[in-house]
């Protein structure tokens, strides 16, 4: 693996459990992270000689991939809404579906946003990077907020980060937008999830008790009813199997213009509601 052209064959021969297409994609992601070369650069620099540090890093990547560690955690970063975002095991890996939620939010006019359960800060930071809004972001995890602050600094976005428990927290101001991608995966759904998610991503940010699947939504809707401005927007990412129940709760709190939106995979994944 001393020569650039040998990296992809080495990945292919070393990794099983991935499709060939996935392996090649992982190899290119690793090469770009370590060498800064894109696919075209790889073709033009096929005989580029790697130093020992670069070779050792690539070997480490392969070992960790064989142990089912997500490439984002191995490299310590990913991209979200065209922004580089640092991640570690205290934060969820941002998903493409959440980019769709951000895109939807940015189609509206607003001057203030509260992101509840911010994790890596990807939602708050991408909104802040693409608007002039005043943004606050809440999380119960100090470790996650440390990563979120690094991401805000790295992307030159000013965010007011708050470390608190959503079940105890009460905002000090009203917001035009409240958004949340709260834990919504049931514990009994673990059997359907991949090993790399179960072994590495933070369960606190993923799972809810089977007996209280909507506990976070109920609390956030209650807060939004008090702390959204009139005609303010509430946005959620949701478990596709609980869309009707969440809509019912919103209607109980007299939210209006409730809109359910499917993600790119055709799953009911996002809800928007307006405070009356």
Where do the protein language model's features map onto the residues?
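A short N-terminal interaction module
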Residues: 1-58
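Conserved AdoMet
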Residues: 33-107
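Active-site beta-alpha loop architecture of Rossmann-like, nucleotide-cofactor-dependent enzymes
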Residues: 72, 185-188, 241
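Conserved SAM/SAH cofactor-binding pocket of Class I
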Residues: 96-192, 219
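Class I S-adenosylmethionine-dependent transferase superfamily signal
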Residues: 127, 197, 220-224
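Conserved Class I SAM-dependent methyltransferase catalytic core
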Residues: 210-274
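Mobile active-site "lid"/loop adjacent to the S-adenosyl-L-methionine
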Residues: 184-215
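Conserved beta-strand segments of alpha/beta enzyme cores
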Residues: 84, 134, 158-160, 256-259
